């Protein structure tokens, strides 16, 4: 009788442990319950104001020109790189300034050609 009782208790314990493990799996998969654990590993978002940018700008050392968009240190303003070079082309204007324009799926140098046409009033 004692062996049957021990066997039954062990069986119940085994089932309860398996059920608990299953629920923990589903909680983690579908975002339920385990929020506290996830928050510990999640990076914090940057501030919604300009304090993060201002702090980095103030701490950047540059003896020449500090580009406001990328915080790159260059010799003259029109040498500033584009913020997103994978999707932007840099076009230097004749007055010593430069602009970054979206590549927009155009073929190579097509964006620069369109800027020139627009400056001439042809576009």
Curated annotation (Swiss-Prot):
Top-level taxon of the source organism: Eukaryota
Signal sequence bounds: 1-21
InterPro entries: LCL2
Entry keyword Signal: yes
One biological process term in Gene Ontology: ERAD pathway
Keywords in alphabetical order: Signal
Family: Belongs to the LCL2 family.
Function text: Probable component of the endoplasmic reticulum-associated degradation (ERAD) pathway.
PANTHER family: LONG CHRONOLOGICAL LIFESPAN PROTEIN 2
UniProt-recorded name of the protein: Long chronological lifespan protein 2
